[in-house]
C-alpha cells in the first residue's frame, strides 16, 4: 500500500543493498534470534495452551462471538486510534509516528495467551481472539494504516507482511489443533502438559526479553518521548480493553482476557513490517519503539499476573480463616449436640424399660427434653 512521508527528512526509496549503521549492526542477529526463538516459543506455548481448550466451549464462542467481537473492536478500533492520538499529542517525527501507528494496527500476540492462563482467564476466548485478529489483520492492517495516514504528508511505500501473517497463522493454529486433540483424547495427560507448558512459556518469555534487550542495545536511542509512549501505550490498551468489556457486560473472566489481549501486540510483525518498508537510516529512529514496547508489555503482563495472584491468595486465605472458624464452631456444637442427644436417648430408654404400667410422672419424665439439639449452618 501507499502512505505519505513528510517534512525535511523525506523517506528515501528502500535500498536492500544499503549497509546498516553501527547502531543497527545487530539487525541480522536480532532477526535470526527473534524469528527462531519466537517460532519455537509460539509452537510450544500454543500446543500446551491448546491442551486447555475444550471443543464445546470453543464452538460456543464461534456460534455466539460476542466476546470475539468486543476483542476485535478493541484490537482494530481502540489500539489504532490510541496510537494516532499518541503520535499527534507528542508531536512525533514522521517516521516515528508511522512506527507507533503500525504497532497499534498489528494483531494480538501470543504472549497474551500465557498471561491469560496465569490470571485464570477464558483460554478458549483468548486463543479465538488471537486467531481471529491475525486473520483480520490481512485486511484491517492496510485499512487502518490508510485511514490514519491519508492526511499525513509522508511519501513511503509501506509493505504489509502478508507472508509473516501467514506464518503466524500456521504456527498458531496447528499447535493449538494438536493441543485440542490431546485434551480430547487424554484429558489427564493434557493437564500435566498444560502446567509444564506454562512454566516453560514463562521462562522463554524472560529469555526472549533479555535477549532482545542485550542484542538490540545498539539500536536504543535516547529519545525519551518514544520510551514514554512505549510505556503508556500497552497500559492504555489494557485499561480501555477492560473498561469496554465491562461496559458490554462481559464476565470478569472475559474482562481480564480481553484486557490482556488488547494491550499485547505482535511485536515480531511490527518489526518485520518496518524492516520491509524503511531504510536502515530510518530504522535507527524507529526500531527502538517496538523493542521497548515489547519489553514494557512483558513487564506490564507480569505485574498484572502478580497483582491478580496476590489478590487471589489473600482472598483464599481470608475464606480459609472463615471456613476454619466455622469448622471449629460446628465441631463444638456437634459435640455438644451429640452428648445432649445421648442423654436424651438414655432418659427415653430408662422410661422404656421400666416394668409395669407407666404413671403420670413417668410419662412426663420420658417426654421431657433434656437439652436442645443445635446445628451449624
UniProtKB/Swiss-Prot annotation:
Keyword Transmembrane recorded: yes
Chain segments annotated as transmembrane: 30-50, 68-88, 98-118, 134-154, 160-180, 196-216, 227-247, 267-285, 291-311
NCBIfam families, A to Z: bass
Membrane-protein topology: Multi-pass membrane protein
Domain of life: Eukaryota
Organism: Homo sapiens
Note: In humans, 3-beta-sulfooxy-androst-5-en-17-one (DHEAS) is the most abundant circulating steroid sulfate in the human body, it is mainly synthesized from adrenal glands and gonads, whereas rats and mice have low circulating concentrations of DHEAS in the periphery as they can only produce DHEAS in their gonads.
GO biological process, one term: bile acid and bile salt transport
UniProt-recorded name of the protein: Sodium-dependent organic anion transporter
Post-translational modification note: Glycosylated.
Family label: Belongs to the bile acid:sodium symporter (BASS) (TC 2.A.28) family.
UniProt cross-references to InterPro entries, sorted A to Z: BilAc:Na_symport/Acr3 (IPR002657), Bilac:Na_transpt (IPR004710), Na+/solute_symporter_sf (IPR038770)
Example GO molecular function: sodium-dependent organic anion transmembrane transporter activity
Alphabetical UniProt keywords: Glycoprotein, Ion transport, Lipid transport, Membrane, Sodium, Sodium transport, Symport, Transmembrane, Transmembrane helix, Transport
GO CC aspect terms: plasma membrane
One Pfam entry name: SBF
Lineage: Eukaryota, Metazoa, Chordata, Craniata, Vertebrata
Amino acid at each position: 500500500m501507499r502512505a505519505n512521508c513528510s517534512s525535511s527528512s523525506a523517506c528515501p526509496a528502500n535500498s536492500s543493498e544499503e549497509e546498516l549503521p553501527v547502531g543497527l549492526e545487530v539487525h541480522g542477529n536480532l532477526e535470526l534470534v527473534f524469528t527462531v526463538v519466537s517460532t519455537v516459543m509460539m509452537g510450544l506455548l500454543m500446543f500446551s495452551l491448546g491442551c486447555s481448550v475444550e471443543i464445546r466451549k470453543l464452538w460456543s464462542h464461534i456460534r455466539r462471538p460476542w466476546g470475539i467481537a468486543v476483542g476485535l473492536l478493541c484490537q482494530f478500533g481502540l489500539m489504532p486510534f490510541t496510537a494516532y492520538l499518541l503520535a499527534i499529542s507528542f508531536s512525533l517525527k514522521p517516521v516515528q509516528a508511522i512506527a507507533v501507528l503500525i504497532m497499534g494496527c498489528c494483531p494480538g500476540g501470543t504472549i497474551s495467551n500465557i498471561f491469560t492462563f496465569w490470571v485464570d482467564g477464558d483460554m478458549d476466548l483468548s486463543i479465538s481472539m488471537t486467531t481471529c485478529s491475525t486473520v483480520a489483520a490481512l485486511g484491517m492492517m492496510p485499512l487502518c494504516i490508510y485511514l490514519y495516514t491519508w492526511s499525513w504528508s509522508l511519501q513511503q511505500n509501506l509493505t504489509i507482511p502478508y507472508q509473516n501473517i501467514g506464518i503466524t497463522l500456521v504456527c498458531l493454529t496447528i499447535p493449538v489443533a494438536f493441543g485440542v486433540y490431546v485434551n480430547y483424547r487424554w484429558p489427564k495427560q493434557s493437564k500435566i502438559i498444560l502446567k509444564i507448558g506454562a512454566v516453560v512459556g514463562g521462562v522463554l518469555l524472560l529469555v526472549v526479553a533479555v535477549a532482545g534487550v542485550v542484542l538490540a542495545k545498539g539500536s536504543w536511542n535516547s529519545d525519551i518521548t518514544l520510551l514514554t509512549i512505549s510505556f503508556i501505550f500497552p497500559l492504555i490498551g489494557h485499561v480501555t480493553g477492560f473498561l469496554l468489556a465491562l461496559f458490554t457486560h462481559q464476565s470478569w473472566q472475559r474482562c481480564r482476557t480481553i484486557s490482556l489481549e488488547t494491550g499485547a501486540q505482535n511485536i515480531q510483525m511490527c518489526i518485520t513490517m518496518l524492516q520491509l518498508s524503511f531504510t536502515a537510516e530510518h530504522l535507527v529512529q524507529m526500531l527502538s519503539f517496538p523493542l521497548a514496547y515489547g519489553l514494557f508489555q512483558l513487564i506490564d503482563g507480569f505485574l498484572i499476573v502478580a497483582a491478580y495472584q496476590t489478590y487471589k491468595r489473600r482472598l483464599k486465605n481470608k475464606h480459609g480463616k472463615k471456613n476454619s472458624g466455622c469448622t471449629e464452631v460446628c465441631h463444638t456444637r456437634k459435640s455438644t449436640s451429640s452428648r445432649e442427644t445421648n442423654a436424651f436417648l438414655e432418659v427415653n430408654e430408662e422410661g422404656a424399660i421400666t416394668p409395669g404400667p407407666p404413671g403420670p410422672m413417668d410419662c412426663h419424665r420420658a417426654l421431657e427434653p433434656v437439652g436442645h439439639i443445635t446445628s451449624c449452618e
